[in-house]
A protein has these predicted regions:
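Metallo-beta-lactamase
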Residues: 3-6, 12, 52-54, 106-166, 170-248, 260, ...
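Conserved beta-strand hairpin/beta-sheet module of binuclear metal-dependent hydrolase folds
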Residues: 12-66, 174-186, 190-191
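Short, structured coil segments at secondary-structure junctions
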Residues: 19, 95-96, 232
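Residue-level marker for buried hydrophobic side chains located in beta-strands
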Residues: 46-48, 77, 100, 182-184, ...
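Active-site HxH/HxHxD metal-binding segment of metal-dependent hydrolases
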Residues: 54-56, 64-146, 259
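C-terminal/domain-terminus segments
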Residues: 114, 119-132, 234-264
Length: 264
């Protein structure tokens, strides 16, 4: 059974946006999902993450609005299995019988075998952090889920590769397209201080590490930020917050990684 609706909002909730060439985003309350067109078959759409609980209608309506008639959802790629990234997956799979891909180390959390660790409300100040023990962390069961290919390729998306970015969760991944240096980071890095309710509501744009209250291994998370810096991304499309584009973010990410190593 799906989790109940959670009354968490931002001013951008329901807003769709073009994030990069062939990549479109949708803010679902406080989290982003992304639609990627298959360059070899432009009517084929890959969904990255599945939003908040009870958000399936918002996601399907955006697909209809954005892609009009004739599109086909081919697969769902999950950056990880937290509730705000898998919230609509159950209903979406009732509408589309498609494969779901996730890192092999994340499989226990989406196959009924393991719950995520308890939230850490005191990891960082902020009202969202204080509320985090109320957020769902229980395992779910996705019948069609399977591990991503071990060679880093992304099904249906030959221009993209997946990068293991653990720390926030053991099997967290990010996606990278080398030709234009687009990084779809998931929660490995985000562009809003997710612990702060005020910043979440207004979507104050600022580079941050993953939400501290749900980050299991903080030092590994910092190392993952450093790994992403070495990709020299020029567009940061994140699981929370407004995308950042227009420059090489290597130095910004290295600075963030150093900060995280020192304070987490």
């Amino acid at each position: 059974m799906s989790d109940p609706f959670m009354p968490l909002f931002s001013v951008r909730s329901g807003a769709g946006f073009k994030a990069a060439d062939g990549v479109y985003g949708l803010t679902v309350q406080i989290a982003n999902v992304y639609f990627i067109e298959n360059p070899s078959a432009p009517r084929e759409i890959i969904l990255v993450d599945a939003g908040m609980p009870q958000s399936s209608e918002m996601i399907t309506n955006e697909m209809k609005r954005r892609f009009k008639e004739g599109y086909e959802l081919k697969a769902v790629i999950l950056t990880h299995g937290h509730f705000d990234h898998v919230g609509a997956i159950e209903v979406l799979l009732e509408l589309w019988n498609v494969p779901v891909y996730i890192h092999e180390k994340e499989l226990p959390y989406v196959t009924g075998k393991a719950d995520y660790p308890p939230a850490r409300p005191d990891a960082k100040k902020g009202l969202v952090a204080k509320l985090s023990p109320l957020f769902p962390r229980h395992t779910i069961r996705i019948p069609s889920v399977q591990a991503l290919p071990s060679d880093g390729t992304v099904p249906f998306l030959e221009e993209w590769k997946w990068v293991h970015t653990p720390g926030h969760t053991p099997g967290h991944i990010s996606l990278f397209r080398d030709k234009d240096r687009v990084l779809l980071a998931g929660d490995a890095v985000i562009t809003v201080e997710q612990e702060s309710l005020a910043d979440v509501v207004i979507q104050k744009q600022e580079l941050h590490g993953p939400p501290a209250y749900f980050t299991a291994d903080t030092q590994t998370a910092a190392a993952s930020v450093q790994k992403l810096a070495e990709l020299e991304p020029e567009a940061l499309l994140t699981g929370h917050g407004i995308p950042m584009t227009g420059k090489n973010y290597r130095e910004d990410l290295l600075t963030l990684a150093e900060k995280l190593h020192s304070v987490l």
